[in-house]
């Protein structure tokens, strides 16, 4: 339980500190990747939601 709590704290700390980097811009050569880079911080939340959906599918055994 403590390990899960630590991972959650690390995740929230990294998202808080990574928000300071939102003012940075990608180089022009990589400008087409801007939409993907904008979505990347949300990807770990998709895995969290996937875990709940998976457990609901197997009836929380």
From Swiss-Prot:
Positions of transmembrane segments: 40-60
Keywords per UniProt: Chloroplast, Membrane, Photosynthesis, Photosystem II, Plastid, Reaction center, Thylakoid, Transmembrane, Transmembrane helix
GO CC term, one of those recorded: photosystem II reaction center
Positions of the pro-segment in this chain: 1-24
Domain of life of the source: Eukaryota
Job of this protein: One of the components of the core complex of photosystem II (PSII). PSII is a light-driven water:plastoquinone oxidoreductase that uses light energy to abstract electrons from H(2)O, generating O(2) and a proton gradient subsequently used for ATP formation. It consists of a core antenna complex that captures photons, and an electron transfer chain that converts photonic excitation into a charge separation.
Cell cycle in keyword set: no
GO BP: photosynthesis
UniProt key word Electron transport: no
Protein's cellular compartments: Plastid, Chloroplast thylakoid membrane
Protein family according to the UniProt entry: Belongs to the PsbK family.
Membrane topology listed for this record: Single-pass membrane protein
Pfam families reported for this sequence: PsbK
UniProt-listed NCBIfam families: PRK02553.1
The protein's name: Photosystem II reaction center protein K
Subunit structure: PSII is composed of 1 copy each of membrane proteins PsbA, PsbB, PsbC, PsbD, PsbE, PsbF, PsbH, PsbI, PsbJ, PsbK, PsbL, PsbM, PsbT, PsbX, PsbY, PsbZ, Psb30/Ycf12, at least 3 peripheral proteins of the oxygen-evolving complex and a large number of cofactors. It forms dimeric complexes.
